Amino acid sequence: MKFSSLSVIGLGYIGLPTAAVFASRKIKVIGVDVNQKAVDTINQGKIHIVEPDLDIVVHAAVTEGFLKATTVAEAADAFIVAVPTPFKGDNHEPDLSYIQAACQAISPVLAKGNLVILESTSPVGATEQMAQWLADARPDLTFPQTHDEQSDIRIAHCPERVLPGHVMRELIENDRVIGGITARCSDYAVALYKTFVQGECVITNARTAEMAKLTENSFRDVNIAFANELSMICDKLDINVWELIKLANRHPRVNILQPGPGVGGHCIAVDPWFIVSKTPEQARLIRTAREVNDSKPEWVINKVKIAIADFMQANPDKTTKDVSVACYGLAFKPDIDDLRESPALSIAQQIMTLHNGAVLLVEPNVQSLPAKLSSAELVEFETAFAQADIHVLLVDHKAFKAAKPSHGIIVDSKGIW
């Protein structure tokens, strides 16, 4: 099984690195995205996201002619769908419309012998749904859900499991779970990924592969929820949670995670709801963990309100408009520029709403603020240290660990100050 060309649908934080790594192995890669600006940037050999070493690989792949980007799908031997799977509205129901749109984009150029892989983190059954959408669009081709191993098109699910900031290494080194709709589909998918994957490609079926990714992130979410709930308990009991966790973790079989302002990102804050949406009666612990982590930003905001009140009491000559609040960090985790599902971003936004004084935002990994924060000021952390009265640490970026505000009231959600 040899693949000389590949199309990657979706050139975001997962799609672009995946496309670039395949292209670095001298496979002709066509990247497809609806964002014309991203397409133009990539075709110049540049990148529109922040990921260490990605720029070097993309530049080389484009320069050598192995990677190009376009807004219209083209024929290829294999297709990887790496598009978002957000929620529908506020009810935590998975929205598969991006996957459906990807199917509509590639169906006209599908040909007998093609492999289609869904990489997007998805609820159980999404790969089968994708296969059905493709079958409906191309009745002239056969698909594995009806023709088993004899199908014209092979379909599989292979969830990504990489850490932002380490994507280029982990894409290559990490094990991959590969779930074909049939065994032959799995074999074709393994052959494709073995182009660059040095980790083990573990074969299962599509539904189990989908559930594996959701399980990994739900497990992490539950453990984070324990730490976050513990931090709120300790606050009530006047106990230093950071010291407590250090002591408890001296037990050889205890490994409590570090609490924070909530849980963010496009995986841990989202994936557990995909399980809950399918099995609401059974997923009680998973739902509760999500609710605990989703409640933590409000707890942090209450701490900020108390800090402002304490400052006002200590400075009776000032009004709230005179009080300056600095928020340190907007990304969903340290040392990246990804603001998706970020509790820090949500907290900063709510502080801007409730506080009528100056709000300074410090995020060393972005050059500009999203539109919903445009009324705030993006500043260097030295400026915030000097000007702010209330210092709210939300993300433990390396830059923030090296220094600490010398005056004002500190609200530290990460325990580094």
Task: Annotate each PLM feature.
Residues 1-417:
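Structural/interface elements that position substrates and couple domains in central-metabolism enzymes
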